From Swiss-Prot:
Chain span(s) of sequence motif Nuclear localization signal: 860-864
Xref: PROSITE patterns: R3H, ZF_AN1
Protein name as annotated: DNA-binding protein SMUBP-2
Species assigned in the record: Mesocricetus auratus (Golden hamster)
Gene name for this UniProt entry: IGHMBP2
Record-stated family: Belongs to the DNA2/NAM7 helicase family.
UniProt function note: 5' to 3' helicase that unwinds RNA and DNA duplexes in an ATP-dependent reaction. Specific to 5'-phosphorylated single-stranded guanine-rich sequences. May play a role in RNA metabolism, ribosome biogenesis or initiation of translation. May play a role in regulation of transcription. Interacts with tRNA-Tyr.
PANTHER family from the UniProt entry: DNA-BINDING PROTEIN SMUBP-2, DNA2/NAM7 HELICASE FAMILY MEMBER
Binding-site residues, Zn(2+) 1: 891, 896, 915, 918
UniProt tissue specificity: High expression in brain and testis, moderate in heart, spleen, and kidney, and low in other tissues.
Domain of life: Eukaryota
């Protein structure tokens, strides 16, 4: 390879690293100078108000201190943060700015954080359990120096074991043809064909082999098999990864295979299961351990003698003796380290831990035969070059379609710093150096199909063992609407659940989506799903905090994290809250496609996405996700959860009617979304308008038409049009016939039932959707003339009070195209009230609308209780207009019939009129919007005003002077009165 190519590559990488380093230093400086402690905590780099919960001595004499948040309430959890195991942190007293000590973070949970302090802090660090402390993440100079040193070594590398590898990796030459390898037996006989092909390919490659492992495909299993086969061939392996967690994962897997492994790194950064394989632990078990301990004891004794004596000659002798002892100690320790390193078949370390300024400097240059870099796609390319220079062959494993390397400098990332070595080589060499694992063992096939089509060119398939598994298949989990679907989309479009509009906030939150998440989790838990099997993923720290405040106390085992915290993890159910809901259509952090891929593919059996489709559809990739869930999953609107959300803003007046009704744990129904051409608001109302009731017996004289099962949900637009025309022809044939009813089979999908509802409404027919689950079917019948038998099917009239026996919602028309939005929304809420009242009805009570000739007492009772005209069944435009006008002149609060023609207040938040009893936003359900509006006004003007919220006017200067004179005069009079009284008192004495 031309020297200029290596030099230009190194120069570019050094420049990018310098930009990254400058950005990190500037960020830290800016935080310390301009950010308050609360702002630092909101950024995730500081933890405030911590108390010491326990102290103990850890491995090799280290002091482990566990901190917990100060207990001020029932929920004691740490705020959302970016701390991870291995971070260098500074400990500060809560009331002081000086740093008490520096330590290494060893463990962090939702409720506590543990820090390891060196022995040097034993006597200086006195921590009181009653005091409060804070932890601040510190910049790490060591990593930057090691990256820079590795690049300079690469620049000067002329001859050595890695010469051919450098030639291939930097583009000077193509990988050599594969060599023939002798037949071998797999340690793991359960490997699938793609995994076996990857193992054989990696062993046969001469310079480089890339294992592309999408989520759940057993990448680590494949890497372990490759390492075991290489060790069997007598090769020495250096295995690295960018994080301690990834390295320890490999340590655990290899330890089960009884191979000689050695883990390099700070003991405090290692998992407990990996600490017994650490270098310090191995040295403690070696033959030289006792000799080394004796030498250290001798050094301590000489130090003690040196302190006691005052004679200069003796002090000089003691110092010389200490030098000799230290020299002997160093020699014996290095000999023990070399012995341990050479005896190990596999040495494991992080990329930076494999640096030549560590224990590996004691080994010869050609000691290792193969370097394995796991999770290569998450590592900066410069960090990969630290281990790559130590062997002639490398095996890279990872997934460049998941999270990229983490960077701070946006400029450096755009210039190429966020582009990993694996991504660059895949684009450069393609199939000549890459083998992809194509069978995944984690996700339901519906989840797999989206990831495969969106990110992996359709090559990813689900193993039969997981292709159809659902939450309901878990032990003790009931078969419910939530546990029987792999994909669920809860759409908040048009429901007013906007993100928090805070200009000064660095993060985003959405309280409305938090409540939807809470309701869905409760539905899953009630069905028997263990909270520890559920993960909630949010893209913003503020949303994570809101979720933890709402859920952690009730479900302590529930994991709530950002996307970065779940890389490499999996859960039975995953709930994603996208947060963003705004009129500008801004998606912000969500625009990173790979983050969404990671979030969705953490789930095994169930994925629920809560988002505003109008906002996220402005991003092409997110639109494909929403469209896929719409086509292949269950779609619900937040309106279906409105019963559980709105009453929080109501007073007792609005909830008396259903105060004894059990609170529903989830939505009452779910339908698949209609075509994309429909407006989201219409979709929401149409979805919420279909209620459920028990399936009725088929009446005589009904006409039954069979319909092929529509189980294949991935239908194209042409198929949807064909089905629409088919249903239209069936209904038009029914209209022309003399049959009284037309019944459709239960094999129709929810989308097909929606089409039938719409077509029946167009023809002025009555359409009932009855039954639950797979037994749900539609019956279309002719409408009875108004007044026949004194009873007519009615829509709930907005101004009318609650009816004694409300008509089932399935008998209501799906939508009224001529009605205003106000009328639709109010009718929607009345329908929900009716559902709750209907759930309390006695079983012996006759169902409304079953017979055309009810008892006279029932007729009288219904006539007496029914107030206000009902909307006509026929499409009478004048009657509809009259109903809308009457609704506009009636209080829009549920169950209130007060007139607002003379006295009424208009709500600026929901654009409706209310009577004086319900006009306050907190009463009729606009409390959140009112508070958000008030916060916006305060944020915009920067002043919090008392009273009406108007700015206090400054007094006129002349009037102010007059008032000041009157005040001075009054004060003078009072002062003179006190003086005269004092004199009179003195005279009397």
């Amino acid at each position: 390879m031309a020297l200029s190519t290596v030099e230009s590559f190194v120069a570019q990488q050094l420049e990018l690293l310098e930009l990254e380093r400058d950005a990190e230093v500037e960020e830290r400086r800016s935080w310390q100078e301009h950010s308050s402690l609360k702002e630092l905590q909101s950024r995730g780099v500081c933890l405030l108000k911590l108390q010491v919960s326990s102290q103990c001595t850890g491995l090799y004499g280290q002091r482990l201190v566990t901190f917990e948040p100060r207990k001020l309430g029932p929920v004691v959890v740490l705020p959302s943060n970016s701390f991870t195991s291995g971070d260098i942190v500074g400990l500060y007293d809560a009331n002081e700015s000086s740093q008490l000590a520096t330590g290494v973070l060893t463990r962090i949970t939702q409720k506590s954080v543990t820090v390891a302090f060196d022995e040097s802090h034993d006597f200086q660090l006195n921590l009181d359990r009653e005091n409060t402390y804070r932890l601040l993440k510190l910049a790490n100079d060591v990593t930057y120096k090691r990256l820079k040193k590795a690049l300079m070594t690469l620049k000067k590398y002329h001859s050595g074991p890695a010469s051919s590898l450098i030639d291939v990796l930097l583009g000077g030459s193509s990988p050599s043809p594969t060599t023939e390898i002798p037949p071998f037996t797999f340690y793991n006989t359960a490997l699938d064909p793609s995994q076996k092909e990857a193992v054989s390919f990696a062993l046969a490659q001469k310079e480089v082999a890339i294992i592309h492992g999408p989520p759940g495909t057993g990448k680590t299993t494949t890497v372990v098999e490759i390492i075991l086969q290489a060790v069997k061939q007598g090769l020495k392996i250096l295995c690295c990864a960018p994080s301690n967690v990834a390295v320890d994962n490999l340590v655990e897997r290899l330890a089960l295979c009884k191979k000689r492994i050695l883990r390099l790194g700070h003991p405090a950064r290692l998992l407990e299961s990996a600490q017994q394989h650490s270098l310090d632990a191995v040295l403690a078990r070696s033959d030289n351990a006792q000799i080394v301990a004796d030498i250290r004891k001798d050094i301590d004794q000489v130090f003690g003698k040196n302190k006691k004596t005052q004679d200069k000659r003796e002090k000089s002798n003691f110092r010389n003796e200490i030098k000799l002892l230290r020299k002997e100690l160093k020699e014996r320790e290095e000999a023990a380290i070399v012995q341990s390193l050479t005896a190990a078949d596999v040495v494991l370390a992080t990329n930076t831990g494999a640096s030549s300024d560590g224990p590996l400097k004691l080994l010869p240059e050609n000691h290792f035969d193969v370097v394995v870099v796991d999770e290569c796609a998450q590592a900066l390319e410069a960090s990969c070059w630290i281990p790559l220079l130590k062997a002639p062959k490398c095996i890279l494993a990872g997934d460049h379609r998941q999270l990229p390397p983490t960077t701070i400098s946006h400029k450096a990332a755009l210039a190429g710093l966020s582009r990993s070595l694996m991504e660059r080589l895949v684009e450069k060499h393609g199939a000549g150096a890459v083998r992809m694992l194509t069978v995944q063992y984690r996700m339901h096939q519906a989840i797999t199909r989206w990831a495969s089509e969106a990110m992996y060119h359709g090559q990813l398939t689900a193993h039969p063992s997981v292709a159809g598994h659902l939450l309901k298949d878990l032990p003790g989990v009931a078969d419910t609407e939530e546990t029987s679907v792999p994909l669920l989309l809860i759409d908040t479009a048009g429901c007013g659940l906007l993100e928090l509009d805070e200009e000064d906030s660095q993060s985003k939150g959405n309280p409305g989506e938090v409540r939807l998440v809470t309701l869905h989790i409760q539905a899953l838990v009630d069905a028997g799903v263990h909270a520890g099997d559920i993960a909630v993923i949010a893209p913003y720290n503020l949303q994570v905090d809101l979720l933890r405040q709402s859920l952690s106390n009730k479900h302590p085992e529930l994991e709530i994290k950002s996307v970065d915290g779940f890389q490499g993890r999996e859960k039975e159910a995953v709930i994603l809250t996208f947060v963003r809901s705004n009129r500008k259509g801004e998606v912000g952090f969500l625009a990173e496609d790979r983050r969404i891929n990671v979030a969705v593919t953490r789930a095994r059996r169930h994925v629920a996405v809560i988002c505003d489709s109008r906002t996220v559809n402005n991003h092409a990739f997110l639109k494909t996700l929403v469209d896929y869930f719409t086509e292949h999953g269950e779609v619900r609107t937040a309106f279906e959860y409105l019963d559980d959300i709105v009453p929080e803003n109501y007073t007792h007046e609005g909830s008396q009617g259903h105060s004894h009704a059990p609170k529903p744990r989830g939505p009452v129904t779910s339908i698949r979304k209609p075509t994309n051409e429909q407006e989201n608001g219409q979709e929401a109302r149409a979805a919420a308008g279909q209620g459920r009731r028990k399936p009725n017996e088929r009446p005589p004289g009904s006409q039954v038409h069979s319909q092929p099962s529509s189980g294949a949900r991935g239908c194209d637009r042409t198929g949807a049009i064909d089905r629409t025309e088919h249903f239209r022809a069936m209904i038009e044939g029914f209209v022309a016939s003399k049959e009284s009813q037309l019944e459709f089979p239960a094999s129709l999908s929810s989308h097909d039932r929606l089409l039938v509802h719409q077509i029946a409404e167009e023809h002025g027919l009555r359409h009932d959707s009855t039954g639950e689950g797979k037994a749900r079917h539609i019956t279309v019948s002719r409408k009875s003339p108004a007044g026949s038998g004194g009873v007519a099917p009615q829509l709930p009239s907005p101004p009318s009070p609650a009816q004694a026996e409300p008509e089932p919602l399935s008998q209501q028309p799906l939508g009224q195209p001529h009605c205003s939005t106000q009328l639709d929304l109010k009718a929607l809420h009345l329908q929900r009230l009716q559902r709750q009242q209907g759930s309390q009805a006695q079983p012996a009570k006759a169902q409304p609308g079953v017979g055309l000739h009810p008892q006279k007492t029932q007729q009288k009772k219904k006539k007496k209780e029914t107030k206000g005209p009902a909307l006509p069944c026929e499409e009478d435009f004048d009657a509809l207009v009259s109903a809308v006008i009457k609704a506009d002149n009636t209080c829009s609060f549920a169950k209130c019939t007060a007139s607002t023609t003379t006295l009424g207040q208009f709500c600026m938040h929901c654009s409706r009129r209310y009577c004086l009893s319900h006009h306050l936003p907190e009463i009729h359900g606009c409390g959140e919007k009112a508070r958000a509006h008030a916060r916006q006004m305060i944020s915009r003007e920067g002043v919090l005003y008392a009273g009406s919220g108007t700015r206090d006017r400054a007094l006129d200067p002349a009037k102010r002077a007059q008032l000041q004179r009157r005040l001075d005069k009054k004060l003078g009079e009072l002062s003179s009165q006190r003086t005269s009284k004092r004199k009179e008192k003195e005279r009397g004495t």
